[in-house]
Every structure is written in C-alpha cells, then in structure tokens.
Amino acid sequence: MNNLIIGIAGGSGSGKTTLAYRLKERFGEDEVRLISHDRYYKRHDELPFAERCKLNYDHPDAFDNDLLIQHLKELKAGRAIDCPVYDYANHNRSSEVQHIEPAPVLIVEGILPLAEPELCSLFDYKIYVDTDADERILRRILRDVKERGRSLDSVIAQYRATVKPMHEAFVEPSKRNADIIIPNGGENGPAIEMLAHHIRSLIQKANLR
C-alpha cells in the first residue's frame, strides 16, 4: 500500500497530540490512522511498580522502536497490526492491543520520533511542534493529574529529574530533522489549515486516493 507516513514530534505538553487529532479531523475517517509513540514504551513486567516509577521514560532507549518500525512497514505493505496499549497509571504496557488497519495517511506522534534515525527515515513528512516551556509544564501537570491518575508531586518530580533534561538533550535537538516547525501545536489554526492543505497535495502527488 502506498501510504504517506507523517512524524510529529515536540516536547511533552507542546500540543503535538492535539495537532495530530486536528489534522485527522480534516480528512475522512478511513483516510488517517494515528499512532502514539508512547504506545511503544518497552514492557517491564520483571520490575515491581516502585521500580517502574523510577525509570527514565523521556530517553530514546525507553522506546521499542524496532517494533514500531516493524509495524509501520507492515502497514505500508497493506497489512493490519496489533498496536500495543500503554497503561500510564501502572507505568507498563497493557495486555491489551488495538487492531489497526492500513490507511492512506499514517501519523506517528510523540516526544522523540524524530530523534531515532531509522524511524525518522520512514517519515515522508516531519513536523516539530515548538511551544514555550512554561506552557508545556502547565499542560503536562493538568494532563497527567486529570487523565493519567498521577499525583502533582510525582509529575513535578519527574519533570525535574528526567523530562526537562531529556528535552534539552534529545527532544529539542531533534527539531533539526523536521521539514517544518509549528509554534503552539493544536492551538495554531492557520498552521493546521496550511498543513492539511500540504498533506492533501502530498496525497495527490503520491496518488494515494
């Protein structure tokens, strides 16, 4: 299958997930599949919960990129995949999977998809979402406490210990691999319309319809 694969990266809380969903809304239901890089965090069944809480989830080594690369190649070949499901509250991969069928456009979003060379090479179009650090930490606190069952203290401690230093070491530098840098992610209406128009033109050029 002649898919178009788009990579969206950016710091935690930058608005990259919102951007991905806003882009999807501008296409038909069967035209786009969204895949979160977070789903491919490595499994750590061998570790107790207290130890899993201490792991660095913002380092490139935290991800099973080999599995994601395999899955993207399967989708590109026209074959469905069983995508992992990640349980944020338990800091581990769930026993459940999500069945995903191929589609003309595949969007992979996360903090580090542009930082892994082999993974990055699969993307036909690469987007980096650039958002002010203060805004990102506020969004992260609200999201992790409300949606992921985290305590305020744990979110702040993780931000200081790994999120901020890993952003500076790996996430921010990965924007040099982007084809375009978008400020403020999902809140940037004009940029979303511009991206949607560009993606449509890429689809037409690739004759994916």
Locations of regions flagged by a protein language model:
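P-loop (Walker A) phosphate-binding loop of NTP-binding proteins
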Residues: 11
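Conserved lysine of the Walker
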Residues: 16
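Hydrophobic positions on the alpha1 helix immediately C-terminal to the Walker A/P-loop
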Residues: 19
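Post-Walker A helix-loop "phosphate-sensing" segment adjacent to the P-loop in P-loop NTPases
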Residues: 25-33
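Conserved nucleotide-sensing/catalytic segment adjacent to the nucleotide-binding pocket
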Residues: 33, 42, 46-90
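Phosphate-binding/switch loop-helix module in NTP-utilizing enzymes
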Residues: 71-106, 113-116, 206
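ATP-dependent NMP and nucleoside kinases share a basic, alpha-helical "lid"
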Residues: 94-148
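NTP-dependent small-molecule kinase module
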Residues: 101-102, 142, 164-209
